[in-house]
Amino acid sequence: MHYKKLVKRHKTQEKQKMEKKWWHHLTAYQIYTRSFCDSNGDGIGDFQGIISKLDYLQELGIGAIWISPFNDSPNYDNGYDISDYYAILKDFGTMADLEEMIQECEKRDIIVMMDLVLNHCSHEHPWFLGACKDRNGKYHDYYIWEEGTEDQPPEGSAAFFGGNVWEWVPQVKEYYYHTFSIQQPDLNWKNENMRQELYAM
């Protein structure tokens, strides 16, 4: 390639790198819904509570809010153990409340970022319940498994919340992998069907 063209292409690439993206010029605010603002007096924060504080956040100059996980969950890890990706935790409100919150944010030019947990799910998720019943079933390969014996787990490091990263399931006589707690089995991203289910969300 001609030298001048190389220089021009390099300058164009550098200019593109220097162009500011939307996240470069605004202030984002993380909201842990459970403790942010309670609208109905039950002691638990909710979407209506967030809505009631949007004018305040706008006055502070907040341009984006990052909402911690709000999907249905048994809450072993503050909502980071999702049992239903298509349902809202009732403590926080309804799907209509969530949609209203998003609409009210849009009116104020506040971007909404949702913390969607895709590394793992809850051990109460229907996929995992199915995976633990049948080694040959559809959902078994949605997770990471290793064979072994009950008294001799595969080699592995410590889980984030302590203990081994491998947990024994007697029904299938295998160990499943969990980076965090035993209630949060890791999803197997090598499985195409599992990936497509997540993409469909």
Task: Write out the residue ranges for each language-model feature.
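Acidic/aromatic-lined carbohydrate-recognition and catalytic surfaces
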Residues: H2, K8, K17-Y199
